């Protein structure tokens, strides 16, 4: 079936009032970026929906890209026909012959934006439904929950037919809610937090701490590969590498074992906050889930958050681990996340970290290290790259990956 257009229906944009045009403009930019390889198509954003005119470009490829664009509620590949009833009947019959099977049910659903057309919606439903029923007696008309809904849209320029409604990614257009920094480890939770953050319209930059020689190149590349899994939702993501070796060594040497984790996290948060300020971010996001590990009790969060007044947003804070894992599998980050490459969150991990660290003691022990000097030297070594669609960083050999898992 040769589709001529894809009709895109907006998600939460319909609730955004006077900001609606800004949101549509942002979505238009994101769709344009997602479809940049398709040179023939044209995108026409309207107030109530977006029309992507294919001009011969591959519909299936475009559909696959659109599935990942946040801000789209659903979309329908459509066929344009002339504004006469015979053309509509001919195209509708060909479409139904291709998709219909004996015993299936159908109905016709017409939407008319051009009220000057000689048939209203009910008349078109009856006329076209009756014709198809006569021509295809093996199909049965059914108004409630039919197998096939043939949608007819009557516009001033043409009439459009479709039989599919494909669910989009939902959410808000990425960038419409500002920019934030995501603290990305190599685990399961933070990539899921990144996905959920993007879905709420926040453009994210990844902040990843690495500690060579204690962490390997594979650990760093794993974090980049996890970032690449989220790129289809946005088109490109900045990846910020922050050297953390000296800080971890100094904290381990100077701080009681039970407070190692707390003070390391405070240093990570300070660094992320300074990077955020320099790069005009508005908030910090992470993959913490309340009570999941020692650093994620409310007492630990309070002791760690003490170093900044910047909003810390935790998209998976109230989720069970199984809920997080399900999302990780859906977005294809789970298998990567469980690859056994240690990141800096797991090295030097004390056997019995404080689950309820005392804030005054935390501040006291932290005075044993030169916080400002350590932060300054780490920031000098920060490296920023952009990860784009198709970038690969780990060995893609399936047998090697299977052995790691």
Curated annotation (Swiss-Prot):
Pfam families the record matches: ThiI, ThiI_fer, THUMP
Keywords, sorted A to Z: ATP-binding, Cytoplasm, Nucleotide-binding, RNA-binding, Thiamine biosynthesis, Transferase, tRNA-binding
Any GO molecular function: tRNA-uracil-4 sulfurtransferase activity
Catalytic activity: [ThiI sulfur-carrier protein]-S-sulfanyl-L-cysteine + a uridine in tRNA + 2 reduced [2Fe-2S]-[ferredoxin] + ATP + H(+) = [ThiI sulfur-carrier protein]-L-cysteine + a 4-thiouridine in tRNA + 2 oxidized [2Fe-2S]-[ferredoxin] + AMP + diphosphate; [ThiS sulfur-carrier protein]-C-terminal Gly-Gly-AMP + S-sulfanyl-L-cysteinyl-[cysteine desulfurase] + AH2 = [ThiS sulfur-carrier protein]-C-terminal-Gly-aminoethanethioate + L-cysteinyl-[cysteine desulfurase] + A + AMP + 2 H(+)
Binding site for ATP: 183-184, 208-209, 265, 287, 296
UniProt pathway annotation: Cofactor biosynthesis; thiamine diphosphate biosynthesis
Enzyme Commission designation: 2.8.1.4
Function: Catalyzes the ATP-dependent transfer of a sulfur to tRNA to produce 4-thiouridine in position 8 of tRNAs, which functions as a near-UV photosensor. Also catalyzes the transfer of sulfur to the sulfur carrier protein ThiS, forming ThiS-thiocarboxylate. This is a step in the synthesis of thiazole, in the thiamine biosynthesis pathway. The sulfur is donated as persulfide by IscS.
Protein name: Probable tRNA sulfurtransferase
Protein's gene: thiI
């Amino acid at each position: 079936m040769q589709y001529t257009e894809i009709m895109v229906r907006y998600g939460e944009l319909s609730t955004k009032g006077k900001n609606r045009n800004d949101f549509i403009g942002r979505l238009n930019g994101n769709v344009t970026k997602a479809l940049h390889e398709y040179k023939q198509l044209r995108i026409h954003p309207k107030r109530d929906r977006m029309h992507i005119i294919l001009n011969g470009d591959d519909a299936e490829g475009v559909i696959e890209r659109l599935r990942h664009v946040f801000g789209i509620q659903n979309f329908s590949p459509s066929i344009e026909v002339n504004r006469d009833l015979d053309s509509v009947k001919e195209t509708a019959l060909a479409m139904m012959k291709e998709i219909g099977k004996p015993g299936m049910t159908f109905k016709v659903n017409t939407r008319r934006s051009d009220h000057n057309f000689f048939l209203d919606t009910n008349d078109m439903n009856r006329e076209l439904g009756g014709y198809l029923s006569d021509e295809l007696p093996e199909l049965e008309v059914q108004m409630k929950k039919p197998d096939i809904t043939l949608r007819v849209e009557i516009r001033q320029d043409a009439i459009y037919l479709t039989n599919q409604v494909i669910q989009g990614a939902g959410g808000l257009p990425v960038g419409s809610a500002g920019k934030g920094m995501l603290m990305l480890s190599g685990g399961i939770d933070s990539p899921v937090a990144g996905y959920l953050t993007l879905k709420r319209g926040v453009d994210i930059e990844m902040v990843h701490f690495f500690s060579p020689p204690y962490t390997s190149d594979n650990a760093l590349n794993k974090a980049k590969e996890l970032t690449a899994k989220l790129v289809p939702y946005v088109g490109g993501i900045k990846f910020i590498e922050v050297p953390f070796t000296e800080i971890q060594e100094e904290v381990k040497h100077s701080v009681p074992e039970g407070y190692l984790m707390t003070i390391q996290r405070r240093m990570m948060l300070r660094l992320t906050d300074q990077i955020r300020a320099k790069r005009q971010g508005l908030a910090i996001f992470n993959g913490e889930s309340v009570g999941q590990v020692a650093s994620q009790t409310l007492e630990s969060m309070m002791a760690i958050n003490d170093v900044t007044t910047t909003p810390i947003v935790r998209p998976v804070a109230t989720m069970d681990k199984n809920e997080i894992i399900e999302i990780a599998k859906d977005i294809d980050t789970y298998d990567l996340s469980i690859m056994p490459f240690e990141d800096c969150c797991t090295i030097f991990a004390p056997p019995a970290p404080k689950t309820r660290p005392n804030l005054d003691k935390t501040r006291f022990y932290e005075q044993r290290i030169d916080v400002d000097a350590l932060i300054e030297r780490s920031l000098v070594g920060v490296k920023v790259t952009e990860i784009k669609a198709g970038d690969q960083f780990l060995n893609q050999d399936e047998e090697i990956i299977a052995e790691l898992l």
